[in-house]
Amino acid sequence: MPSKKMKRRTFVKTAAAVALTPTILNSSTWAGAGRRRSPNQRINVALIGCGKMAKDYHLPELLKQPDVQLVSVCEVDKTRRDFFQNQVNQHYSSGKRNFNGCDAGFDFREIISRADIDAVCIATPDHWHALPLIAACQAGKDVYCEKPLTLTIREAQLCVEAARRNNRVVQTGSQQRSNVFGPFREAVEFIRSGRLGKISRVTIGVGAPSKPCDLPEEAIEPGLEWDMWLGQAPARPFHSDLSPRGMHNHFPSWRSYQEFSGGGHTDMGAHFYDIAQWALDRDQSGPIKVIPPEDVSSNTGARFIYDDGVEMIHGGPSGCVFYGEKGKLHIDRGRLTSDPEEIVKTPLADHEVHLPKSPGHHRNWLDCIESREHPVADVEKGARTVTIAHLGNLAYWHRRAFDFNPETWSFKDPNDNHLLDRPRRAEWQLPEV
């Protein structure tokens, strides 16, 4: 069993062990840099976070990959940790591959320090995304990280820098880019091919921002490392709504609270702002201004202004609605419609935009680990997308507009830059990248 405490200087030393060459390589350079450290020529992967998303999605996806060996699981709840360990061991022991057993612990730092682990899949609550991601990159691991990528704008910037400076392949879990749940790639192809003409606005129908946590204290049962679950968040008593004990089939309510998440706005915004960014060809940039709704009680209606005048609005039907000179297009899970209908009914011609097809979100990540190319939902795409939602939340929480510089990841008014991050407990400060 891993030790419960690891001093921060040990964590920083471990996390920074290979961060000695801050060279940023382009995709063509990466393509010749493929590597396999595993003696059995498989990619040794550790799963960090064993909740519902990991149980329903990541675990089965990883176990079915022939070139992956899931060698470790990390989870603060002992019941879930044991369940995942048993699932992995049963899966591999029933096959013919050479398997030495999957280990389990609750401290991600001990996993990241292991030389035999090539990559990590992070499926923790939102406030526990950035630190393991950055540390994994600095320790030479490739990363798949659930969306929304971060809790703050500063974390988003550092995740990109950590990946680039350490030449890591980092996939954001915005799997709609791999056409999971609907024809999202096709919608983007229609828009980029000019089927709508010049785009004037986009509406994004997703949930509301989070609120301060006001849950009462509950008695905690043995088997949960509650202080580790809190991590950077302020110390507070346990409540089962935040981390239900054992295995469960629902999404816990930590997403509703500011201390741990940006709410439905970042949760589903990480999917649909992402599709809007993709369609607008803004994957390396973002809006320059956010304006809150006039109704001070409203949690929808924030407006995001791009430097070319395109306006994105939080609100409207579920998914994304694009409005252009020649009509409109609505893309949502299981739905792609347009007015006029011919916009999406007419097949793409050879001369129009055809984007690469992803073989699946995990498969794309694993293939890129070999090729050293950027995956379909590369870390910067995820970082730029979540920054939009963070800007919107700041506009809602403070009921004011902000001017933002996407190139510097900072506000035009330096007096606002303290809002790029938030206070965090001493043990969990952001490392130098």
Could you tell me what each predicted segment is?
Residues 147:
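Short basic (Lys/Arg) and small-residue
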Residues 168, 211, 252-262:
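Flexible glycine/proline-enriched surface loops and loop-helix/loop-strand junctions
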Residues 150-228:
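A contiguous active-site-proximal alpha/beta segment in oxidoreductase catalytic domains
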